[in-house]
Curated annotation (Swiss-Prot):
Protein family per UniProt: Belongs to the RNase Z family.
Domain of life: Archaea
Record protein name field: Ribonuclease Z
Entry keywords, A to Z: Endonuclease, Hydrolase, Metal-binding, Nuclease, tRNA processing, Zinc
UniProt source species: Saccharolobus islandicus (strain L.S.2.15 / Lassen #1) (Sulfolobus islandicus)
Active site: D65
Binding site for Zn(2+) 1: H61, H63, H133, D201
Amino acid sequence: MIQIFFLGTGAGSPSKKRKLPAFLVRREGLNILLDCGEGTQYTLMNNKLGINSIKIIGITHMHGDHVFGLLGVIASMGLLDRKETLYILGPRDLKDFLYTSFEYSKFNPSFKIEFIDNYNDQNITIATFKTCHTVESQGYLISERDRVKIDEEKLEKEKIKDWRVMRKLKEGKTVEYNGKFLKPEDYLVIKRGLKVAYTGDTIPCQSVIESVKGADLLIHDSTFLNEPSAFTYGHSNVADAAKVALEASVKLLALTHISPRYEDVTEHLKVARRIFPKSILPDDLSYITLK
């Protein structure tokens, strides 16, 4: 199970309804923050989302609405006596930006900060992919590893209830049971891992489409409803995001990075759903659960 909290779904500058980009992804105790607009630490604390429980932060690019909240988050982690290593992914200039800011503000983190290009553990991987914005930018693909599970329905049909048999089958061993040899390949099924993709700011481009294929959730730049100059600014219109979702065969599309010029987003959803019916436009502080 993966939960995604939409902490900030706005763009450029905050509005009454939408804060700046930030998304918290949770999976069984692992907390990942994607982008960190100004005010993210307040949102985390005010909603008891555990600022010090964040293990990994991924920044898509160096525009202020995506990164100006990072210093505050890290400073608060220090004030809250963090001890665990914080892992950060991001553009090449991010490390210099942070440490120069630390130097000028006389802040010395009490915990280790490690800059990484990707992340792997026994349960998930985090990979980056190229996006198409006006500055160096990257998206993030969070992927659960596929898991082997016992076909409980088949065992029940065959009236096999011995947990020792189940354990050995899961270990890949052939088991003798009631005079019959049970082969693991006949009782094991592969549960495909979930995939969450986040583009940050981008125009629709092939590198994004190829990277997010089959994702269970695609969080895609949808800055404008129908702005002819959207591509000039490195952003997507709602229809562009929907077309990417359709071509990439994703399961669910979340429209985000909504320009503050829009108070009513009813038309955004109508446009997106004409192209890709499984589209949503989350409000700040909403969340979804993928299973």
